[in-house]
A protein has these predicted regions:
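Short, low-complexity, intrinsically disordered N-terminal peptides in bacterial proteins
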Residues: 93-96
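Conserved ATP-binding subdomain of kinase catalytic cores across diverse folds
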Residues: 36-54, 59-68
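Active-site Asp-x-Gly
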Residues: 1-42, 49, 76, 82-85, ...
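C-terminal/domain-terminus segments
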Residues: 58-90
Length: 96
C-alpha cells in the first residue's frame, strides 16, 4: 500500500491510518467500542506494516480532537459520540 494525502502534505503513515479509525465512528456503537477500534487498528497494522501503537495513538488524537471541535461548533450530541469513544479507548489502553 502507498498512502497519499489528497492535499499533497507529507505525514507519517500512522497519522492517515488513525484518521480511518476516526471515520468509522458509526461502527463503534456497540457493547465494546474500544475493542472494535483496537481490532480495526490491528487489522490496519497487519495490512500496511505500520506500527499498531502509532495508529492507535493518532486515532485517539483524531477522535478526541474531532469531539472537541464538534462541541465548539455546537454539535454537542455528535461530539458526545467521539468523546465517549475517546474515553473508552483511554480506559482500555490504561488496562493493557
Amino acid at each position: 500500500y502507498r498512502l497519499v494525502d489528497p492535499d499533497g502534505m507529507v505525514f507519517e503513515a500512522a497519522y492517515d491510518l488513525g484518521i480511518l479509525l476516526r471515520n468509522w465512528i458509526d461502527t463503534y456503537r456497540q457493547a465494546d467500542p474500544a475493542e472494535e477500534l483496537l481490532r480495526r487498528a490491528i487489522w490496519l497494522s497487519e495490512q500496511t506494516a505500520v506500527a499498531k501503537n502509532a495508529i492507535i495513538s493518532w486515532g485517539f488524537v483524531e477522535i478526541v480532537s474531532t469531539g472537541i471541535h464538534l462541541a465548539e461548533l455546537g454539535y454537542v450530541e455528535e461530539a458526545k459520540d467521539y468523546l465517549q469513544l475517546g474515553e473508552a479507548v483511554a480506559t482500555r489502553l490504561t488496562q493493557m
